[in-house]
Amino acid sequence: MTIKQGDKVQVIAGSYKGEITEVLKVIRKSNSLILKNINIKNKHVKPKKEGEVGQIKQFEAPIHRSNVMLYDEESQIRSRSKFIISQDGKKVRVLKKLVKN
């Protein structure tokens, strides 16, 4: 998966389409991501002990990685990514729209 924790992404599908946010967590097993302030759900929690009050907790639910694209803030472009080998021999991840073949 080419999207990593801390990357800036743009949501390209769903009710949050067009939103630009940060990746908080990557779930490789299900190919999904948890994004900051995106796909917020409510969970109703029952009281566990006597005298305790029930709660409604909000959490960020995962979104599939096919619904987001990497985003570059400097050029304000979203794009897929690829890996190239730099002149000093390191493997570097770059956006396809920003690099010429």
Swiss-Prot record:
Record-linked Pfam families: KOW (PF00467), ribosomal_L24 (PF17136)
Keywords in alphabetical order: Chloroplast, Plastid, Ribonucleoprotein, Ribosomal protein, RNA-binding, rRNA-binding
Disulfide bonds: none
GO biological process: translation
GO molecular function (one): structural constituent of ribosome
SUPFAM superfamilies cross-referenced by the UniProt entry: Translation proteins SH3-like domain (SSF50104)
Annotated localization: Plastid, Chloroplast
Gene3D superfamilies in UniProt: 2.30.30.30
Main location as per UniProt: plastid
CC terms in the record's Gene Ontology section: chloroplast; ribonucleoprotein complex; ribosome
Functional description taken from the UniProt entry: One of two assembly initiator proteins, it binds directly to the 5'-end of the 23S rRNA, where it nucleates assembly of the 50S subunit.
Alphabetical list of PANTHER family matching this protein: MITOCHONDRIAL RIBOSOMAL PROTEIN L24
Similarity-based family: Belongs to the universal ribosomal protein uL24 family.
HAMAP family linked to this entry: Ribosomal_uL24_B
Matches recorded under NCBIfam families: rplX_bact
Subunit structure: Part of the 50S ribosomal subunit.
Protein name per Swiss-Prot or TrEMBL: Large ribosomal subunit protein uL24c
Name of the gene: rpl24
